[in-house]
């Protein structure tokens, strides 16, 4: 089996798939808004028609994964319940209801009489998306790709191969029925192909890895294709001294236990020293009753946290029912801790002091900074994007949950009437630079 640290040369079969995908993406980029909406509705219809087969495939994948002994967090992401499938199908339809991201005029400017400049949004081209376990991501990513006029090459975790194949088969039926090229969605099933994808710079315009920090860094260092980075989700929640304790506990619980395998689940809880005793007195029994393993610094350990933390805990994304707890002297210490250990995904503060909230949100350089709400809101669907293709923790845009707006770029269109630069250099013509 190909090691993750090998980048093989694409074989002829993969090259042929990439060529077909590239051609299909060009065709998709030329479709109009109504065509793409119709395609999405039909893709959702065929997912519904094939839901029994999709669930059965997932049950088989899950059984095999259990036998292999994969982690609880991966098993949680792998499991596709009927409810989760229905939510995914509804998400496909909702993407169709979003404003068309293609062809939006961002600038329209008269440079001189008869010389008109436009900047318009256009599809990126072909997306290469590598992700782990979550089969519902196939629906999200594919719908966003088609809605934005792109093609997409998908590589999910091998533990979800049967589920992913069943989902992609249904999506392709929808594309066929809508008269769009079914090759606009391409699924790879081997690790060798996923690594060889990194050498497809002639065919792929953007790679979006959704996996471990190790995987993301490796991809960034081993491809000439631009990478939209989504590394670890080491999210923090700071409980201030001016706080409604009941609200703080409710938000902290939701941030950890609502879906602990998610990248936006909180991993470290920071508590002001003046609040710590009263908060932990209420929080420890609640976390214990929800099977959360609490790991704390010496101060929180002395206040009843069961296990003592080490340095590694502050930089660990557990993706499980485990929570690190640290007691801090003040807001400044909380900010310093987050600046040191945060993966720049999502960090939040619980406080009644608006000045403290504003200071926290201004100084924390994460893609999402939250005040008095759960970190679990850091999600494209919850932001109203319809769905997300990934979350970017980089500083340059797109940043945070990436929906449709992150899957288009722009081109400059300049239309003239035989204009030449020399006429402007000589003074025969002048620039008007007037927005129209």
UniProtKB/Swiss-Prot annotation:
Keywords: Amino-acid biosynthesis, Cytoplasm, NADP, Oxidoreductase, Proline biosynthesis. The keyword Amino-acid biosynthesis applies. It comes from the Bacteria. Coiled coil: none annotated. GO terms for biological process: L-proline biosynthetic process. Pfam families: Aldedh. Its EC number is 1.2.1.41. GO terms for cellular component: cytoplasm. It is found in: Cytoplasm. Pathway: Amino-acid biosynthesis; L-proline biosynthesis; L-glutamate 5-semialdehyde from L-glutamate: step 2/2. Catalyzes the NADPH-dependent reduction of L-glutamate 5-phosphate into L-glutamate 5-semialdehyde and phosphate. The product spontaneously undergoes cyclization to form 1-pyrroline-5-carboxylate. This is Gamma-glutamyl phosphate reductase. It comes from Prochlorococcus marinus subsp. pastoris (strain CCMP1986 / NIES-2087 / MED4). The lineage of its organism: Bacteria, Bacillati, Cyanobacteriota, Cyanophyceae, Synechococcales. The gene is proA.
């Amino acid at each position: 089996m190909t090691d993750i640290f090998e980048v093989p040369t694409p074989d002829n079969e993969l090259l042929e798939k990439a060529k077909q995908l590239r051609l299909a993406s060009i065709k998709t980029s030329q479709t109009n808004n109504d065509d793409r909406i119709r395609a999405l509705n039909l893709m959702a219809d065929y997912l519904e028609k094939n839901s029994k087969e999709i669930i059965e495939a997932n049950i088989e994948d899950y059984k095999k994964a259990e036998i292999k002994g994969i982690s609880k967090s991966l098993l949680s992401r792998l499991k596709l319940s009927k409810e989760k499938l229905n939510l995914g199908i509804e998400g496909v339809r909702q993407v169709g209801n979003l404003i068309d991201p293609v062809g939006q005029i961002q600038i329209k400017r008269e440079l001189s009489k008869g010389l008109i400049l436009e900047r318009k949004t256009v599809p990126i081209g072909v997306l290469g998306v590598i992700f782990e376990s979550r089969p519902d991501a196939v629906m999200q990513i594919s719908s966003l790709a088609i809605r934005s006029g792109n093609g997409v090459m998908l590589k999910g975790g091998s533990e979800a191969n049967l589920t992913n194949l069943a989902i992609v088969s249904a999506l392709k039926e929808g594309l066929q029925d809508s008269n769009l090229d079914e090759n606009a969605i391409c699924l790879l099933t081997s690790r060798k192909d996923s690594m060889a994808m990194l050498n497809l710079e002639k065919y792929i315009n953007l790679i979006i890895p959704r996996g471990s920090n190790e995987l993301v860094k490796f991809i960034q260092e081993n491809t000439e294709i631009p990478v939209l980075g989504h590394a670890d989700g080491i999210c923090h929640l700071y409980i201030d001294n001016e706080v409604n304790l009941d609200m703080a506990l409710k938000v902290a619980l939701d941030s950890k236990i609502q879906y602990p395998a998610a990248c936006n689940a909180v991993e470290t809880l920071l508590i002001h020293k003046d609040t710590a005793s009263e908060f932990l007195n209420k929080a420890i029994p609640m976390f214990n009753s929800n099977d959360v393993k609490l790991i704390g610094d010496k101060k929180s350990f002395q206040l009843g946290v069961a296990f003592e933390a080490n340095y590694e805990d502050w930089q660990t994304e557990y993706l499980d029912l485990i929570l690190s707890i640290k007691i801090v002297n003040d807001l400044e210490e909380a900010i310093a801790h987050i600046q040191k250990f945060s993966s720049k995904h999502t960090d939040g503060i619980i406080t009644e002091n608006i000045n403290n909230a504003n200071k926290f949100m201004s100084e924390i350089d994460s893609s999402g900074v939250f005040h008095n709400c759960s970190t679990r809101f850091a999600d494209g669907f919850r932001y109203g994007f319809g769905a997300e293709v990934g979350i970017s923790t980089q500083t340059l845009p797109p940043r945070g949950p990436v929906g449709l707006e992150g899957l288009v770029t722009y081109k400059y269109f300049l239309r003239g009437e035989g204009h030449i630069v020399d006429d402007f250099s000589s003074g025969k013509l002048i620039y008007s630079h007037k927005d129209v």
